[in-house]
Amino acid sequence: VAINERSAAPVQRDQAMMVKIDQLRRVMDLYPSTLWAKRAQVLAGVLLIDREPAEAVKLLRAAQSDMPVLDDYLRLWIGESLLRLNEPIQAAELLETIPTAVRDSNLIARAAYRTGEAWYLANVCFRAVEWAERALGLADKDPAAPLALWHQADCHTRENRFPEARATLKQLWLRYPHSPEARDAKARLDTVLEGESWAPTAEDHYLRAQAFLGLAMQGEAVEELRRFLALAPAHPRRSEARLKLGVAYVRLKQYDQARETFRGLVADRVQESSEATVWLARVYLRQNQGDKLIELTRSAAQGSLGGDQRAMVHLFAGVWLEDQGRFDDAISMFRQVATLGNSASQRAEGLWRVGWVQYRTARYRESAETFRAIVELQVNGFEPQAIYWAARADEREQKTGAAEQYARVCQRHTYSYYCQLASGRASLPLIVPAITVVESPVREDGERLPENRRPEIERHPVYQRGLELKTLGFSQDAARELASLTEQYSRDQDVLLAFSTLLSEVGAYYPALRVAKIHFREKLERSGIPTASALWTVAYPAGLLPTIVAQGVKAVDPYLAAAIIREESQYDEKAISVVGAVGLMQLMPATANAVAQRYGFPTVGREELFDQETNIRLGVRYLGQLLDQYGGNLAHAVAAYNAGPMAVNNWIAMHRGRDQDEFVELIPYQETRLYVKRVLRSYGEYRRLHNGTS
């Protein structure tokens, strides 16, 4: 029985709900003593919480003796039903029992918030305040936190505890600045509470700015940081705030303001000056102020910068020199990067840049030697591209052996972007992952567990709850339970694979994919490591493909959209980037609304973009626009999805006639360059895993 019907109209949802409830009642009547009748009773009870709460209470209470594994959930659902019946005291007293009745419950924080809410509705303020404080201590980032603080403040006001009310309202305004309750809190604070007026301090503005930065709301953070700096000319955290302000300006692409902020920090020679120097170099590069960037490399050599920081400044200078066509000077600068860097990755980056400039200026023999020197460094992440481009350089020189080098890429890094390129150039056979076992089409949940751990795990109450919730169709609740077990069994890969498979099956793609990326990276990227087929299903989720296909955008291969979701958000529908892109396909609100307007959809707010269907509807259409704009060229369209069409148009004009693999390496923005490689790699893997179909 499906619970979620968000896409249907209200009348249709209502009719569908009645049909489901009737079906569940038939199961209960026809098979009264079976487990399925007990499950039907639970489902019917949950479905009736809003419609017929009295009947819901009756059904859910009867289920308590039949389904003890769900005791904490049943208590929560009964409590919700009692609140609908305007019985807040009964609800609160029941909700209070959850932590003691089910000590390993994953609902304790949620129950604490609902308990506080129930006591507030019952006008028992001292209990409401107590439970709100407990809930905030357990999970202060819960969406219910702002309302809990608002109720706390209201209770303090009712009982004439005005200092406590003021402190709580202030906490609400500072820590949850984006919430509707924060606006109400500010309005309440602006009134005189018991003869005292209130005005935010400099410290208040700084704390509020940090909260906005945590939400990637850069514009709002800038306003608060500027207020802080205006009010606190001698504050000990002033330099720290200026650095945060400069970075926020960069995120907002306000480079003039960022430049002046960083220049001031560098001149002041404070603790933040070194980091500000690197940021200033980045801004000089973005603004094409090469002379100042070169000058900065000289002053950086005499300052207090660390080796990697000096290397970064020289790297930006080298990129500018390369952009100006001063290739010999660029090579010299990149060699300094390789010398200055403390970390192996920074040294490899410098050498890679040297080799790439040599390649793009047709010094193929020299570039091949440089790329092979990188391979010898054995720095993670650089080997496949160095082997590939050494082979490309040899190919340009018409040397024999390039095919063997392409094969070497795929032997060592089978599932990499560079193996995909190498396969295309050398006509290598399609590589199929090595599978440890041949799985039957359908396996019971418990059969996925390794034999030596199965009895122990099957007895675990959290595992039992997770499976029962999965069976009932409560996917989010099942995911919560199963995800909590991945931490407990983090050292047992067989168990983790079983849990991640179950998570993926209930639609919890983000935690499942996270497990795969953290614990199975080698198996997913290198050849010769036996890999269970279930791991590929977890690592490349296909559950949203029907939603993507349903958009009917013919220009978009659904696997390409899935690859973008995988790399943009890792299937986390609540993801927010540092620049404020939102949701599964990481849409900027302005871009989303431009697409909505073009296709006749209603305007959308930032919060609506967290809805997966809304995000996919707009994201797939935007991707389709870009594919049409660039004549189906994947690299151009994917780059534009990340960096914007204006930047990509400039790059196309600069590098017209280049092969696609060369164009990708020539993308000047490192973030975009790496992004394009990741998306194209994931796209290739999706197509390979689905037998090349689209």
Predicted regions and their residues:
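Acidic, polar-rich low-complexity tracts and alpha-helical solenoid repeat scaffolds
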Residues: V1-V579, M585, Q597-R598, G624, ...
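Catalytic and substrate-binding regions of cell-wall glycan-acting enzymes that process beta-1,4-linked
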Residues: Q405-H413, L503, L584, G632, ...
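Acidic/histidine metal-binding catalytic segments
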Residues: V556-A563, Y630-V638
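Short glycine- and hydrophobic/aromatic-rich loop-to-beta-strand nucleating segment
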Residues: M585-L587, I616
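Active-site substrate-binding loop specific to GH73 endo-beta-N-acetylglucosaminidase modules
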Residues: A594
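A short, structured beta-strand-centered segment in the mid-to-C-terminal lobe
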Residues: V604-T614
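Histidine- and acidic-residue-rich, metal-dependent catalytic cores
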Residues: G619
